[in-house]
């Protein structure tokens, strides 16, 4: 099975900083979304490291940036053009679901994957949508 992760978990996966995350993924294929990937890149590009990298040492940030510039081929990111229509349907049908959440749910559906997010990205819209559609959804505290 594949696991779709948010930007917080992608950051931690690439940095190999979190044994609990490694255990939660447990050898499964990894995927993320275009929007979460872009949000992590934006944070890494800021001189201060942005919200996702605040407090990281310069060498840690450089290593993460290198991984973001050349994202490993084994991390799946479905092209937006494959997801856009489904995202539109999801947002139209599920009150409170954001575009970030819609892309995550659409990706999980497309890949027949689990969706695991940082507790920071958990919200009632994405949680309820996954429950309604039978998408396996979970959170990890960071």
Per-segment meaning from a language model:
Residues 1-39, 43-60:
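Short, well-structured N-terminal submotif of metal-dependent ribonuclease cores
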Residues 32-33, 37, 105, 109-142:
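Acidic, PIN/NYN-like endoribonuclease modules and their adjacent C-terminal/linker elements
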